[in-house]
Design a protein with these regions (language model features):
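A short, N-terminal "cap"/entry segment at the start of jelly-roll beta-barrel domains
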Residues: 1-43, 57, 124-139
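A short beta-strand-loop-beta hairpin characteristic of the jelly-roll/cupin
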Residues: 55, 63-90, 100
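Ligand-binding loop in jelly-roll beta-barrel domains
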Residues: 84-85, 90, 98-123
Length: 139
């Protein structure tokens, strides 16, 4: 079984399609399965899956924004600017308040998936450099 097939089976939600709309804000390949969206719902809810080593850029949620991450598969990382990275595993929950600069993504050798519940707008910033990322220990 390929790693992609294993990742599809490990998650509780479908993998979704390649995350082409946001690819410019990611280092590596991610997949997005929108779970809840619509004008009557004030948040977006989606399952995001990251290939090993994939991570998003530094970013923050603005205009009344916040984000909740519910880890559903694999191993990954979350880091706020100026703080140490936090290792993430299945069952972890991350609460990200408005304006907090952060990034999240997969460990070097693991697929990673989370449900992201996001309100407001996202302000995308610089990429997490390979040098920064390579300093992380193996998860």
């Amino acid at each position: 079984m390929s790693e992609l097939d294993a990742a599809k089976e490990a998650g509780i939600f479908l993998l979704g399609n390649t995350n082409d709309a946001y690819a410019q804000y990611f280092s590596g390949q991610s997949y997005l399965n929108p779970l809840v969206a619509g004008p009557a719902i004030p948040v977006n809810v989606g399952n995001v899956t990251f290939e090993p080593g994939c991570r998003n850029n530094w970013h923050r949620h603005i205009n009344g924004g916040y984000q909740l991450l519910l880890v559903t598969a694999g191993k990954g990382w979350y880091q706020e600017a100026g703080k140490k990275p936090q290792k993430l595993t299945v069952g972890d929950v991350v609460v990200i308040k408005e304006g907090v600069k952060h990034w999240h993504g997969a460990a070097k050798n693991s697929w990673f998936a989370h449900v992201a519940i996001t309100a407001g707008a996202s302000e995308w910033l610089e990429a997490v450099s390979d040098e920064e990322y390579d300093q992380l220990p193996d998860a």
